[in-house]
Amino acid sequence: MSAYSFSRVPVKVPLVKTKNRAIQTKIPAPGTEDILIKLDNYESRSMQGTVPLVWESAYGFNVFDIKGNKWIDFTSAIFLTNIGHSNPRLLKAIRATLEKKLIHHFTYPS
């Protein structure tokens, strides 16, 4: 279990406005409490020490919540460091693949 757990009730925090970050509401963002409480019940207890952030969208190395708070994604090293979130070239390739009649077959190359 994590040694620290963030509040699931929105608390007032200092406002932030920089090129890469914007915190303009209480944290967690109002309206995300129910999701965070459900996550506490289903996710590993070791995850409960993470910042209480429910992603709404992401671009480049930034993620956004439903209230427009803008965060730097320091977790992207696992998946997206090389290309970033919503990379236009990757999105184009994914869309082209989804338009094919066959996306994958277990036994044969596709």
What are these regions (language model features)?
Residues F6, P10-Q24, A29, E43, ...:
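Glycine-rich loop-to-alpha-helix module at the N-terminal edge of alpha/beta enzyme cores
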Residues A29-T32, M47, A58:
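Intrinsically disordered, low-complexity segments enriched in small/polar residues
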Residues T32-K38:
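Flavin-binding catalytic cores
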Residues D40-E56:
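Short, basic/aromatic recognition patches
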Residues P52-F74:
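Active-site and channel-lining beta-strand-loop segments
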